[in-house]
Amino acid sequence: TTSGVSGITSSTGLPSGVTASYSANTLTISGTPTATGTFNYTINLTGCSDDATGTITVFAPPGGISSNLKLWLKADAGTSSTSDAADVNTWTDQSTNSYSASGYSAGGKYYENGINFNPTITFDGANDYYTISGGIIGSGVNIDDAFVYYVGTFDTDNTQMAVFHESCSDAANGGENSYWKFQREADAEIFYNKGRANSSYSLVRDDWGGASSQPYLWTAVAASSTSTPQGTNKYITRNDNLILANNGTSNAEGNGGDFHIGANNTGGHDFDGNISELIIYEGVSSASDEDKIQSYLALKYGISMGTTSSTFSYLSSDGTTIWTGNATFQNNIAGIGRDDNSGLHQKQSKSVNYGAILTISTQAIAADNDANTTSLDDGEFLMWGNNNASTSSYADLPTGGGYTGRLQKEWLIDMTGTVADVHVEFDLSDLHLNLAGDEASDFYLLTDADGDFTSGATATVATSFSSNKVTFDDFNFSDGQYFTLATKQSAPGGIASGLHLWYNASTQSHNTGTTQATDGQDVDNWHDQSGNNFDANSNQGDASWDEDG
């Protein structure tokens, strides 16, 4: 409140979407910011010799959900170094609490392209954890509800590895030893405890069901009521698939113990893997809010949520459905898109699932998402998922147009807004098919309105074919469109019609896995080149490969 001022002469430094006004001796700054960051403003008041100055900090929270955000560590912000493979000595919380996590010794290492072209912090399991001194609960404060969202990997089997740990007390039970912790156990269980140590009231744990080094989105919940998205006090999900849910509550009162990331309170249970993002809310998330937070993380990191039997619809921060759960195509979901209210701008994506062959980008694929200099508009999304058909299966197509067949695997597009002129790339390295195509003109992107492709499909010839990668530049998809890759199928004498089985000693006769056998090596499996998947595997003893025949 001021006096003797008649109005505002000028203002500078306010974030876009925020304005200053003066009326009835009161200066008001208001609006909805459309940009994030720290803004130092100056307002010159008419009739006053002193300017009004101040600082406004605007941040875009995960999924647009800022209420009760307790901790937000992400590898693409707040790290003391952004040089590839460099030590990260400090990691700063992106919530308004601005906790600073200090690395023990050198801390973890920063990698620019960790998960789906986004950065990650890598821990080697040897005392490279972080500490927030004094913890984040607050001494003498009870944390009733704690919702944890974590994206990363566990890279070692049969080892206890803590994502985070803070010692606390159970004041209601005489200060009994308690802790707050999320980790993977040595017996391949996932473990979340908030309260009394290993009590059924505070603990939820079960077989984790995952694979080492595979990125997942974990959600771990311990709440004082059952008004949670799962209807229970406690639960853990992996990629929205329920691991375990149960009831029971326990007090977790802060006692000034440090909060550790990548180890327990004594430095044990060292973490070996990657942490790309760790988010904690102190409060109960609604089902809609949880979906928004998970959708933000899943799109950013190329994580496929749900299953064909339990589908998941991805939401933007304003509640718009950007991927509608699909009982056929809820596999290997990925997407590009921009959501300013989440601080999300994903410009190139590939599913992190094993065997994914498709990448889509706003331009030729860059080294990482940050290096991609193009831009989408806020609210634009292009999502895709596939039917989970084998990449070793081939479907015949009517002759003509330079191709004889297509992959059995096909994809579905779900578009919000208009995302145009995208770069589409198929990596054929893992295909167990003997394709005859050896130049761009041999490959076609087939699009279709119904996913049948036998009639009414549109074929677009590839832009390039190099290093086993087929690319299509400046391609425009339509919402609800199906697509797949078509080419010539190699066949004996060029006759593919009616081909039922074809073993060729010179192609895909493997000693182990997908490694081509060399002279004198045993052949463990021999892949059928017909596209019908009649692969032959050794049951007892092995035939050997002779390069001279």
Segments the model singles out, each with a brief description of its role:
Residues 28-36:
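Extracellular/luminal low-complexity segments enriched in Ser/Thr/Pro
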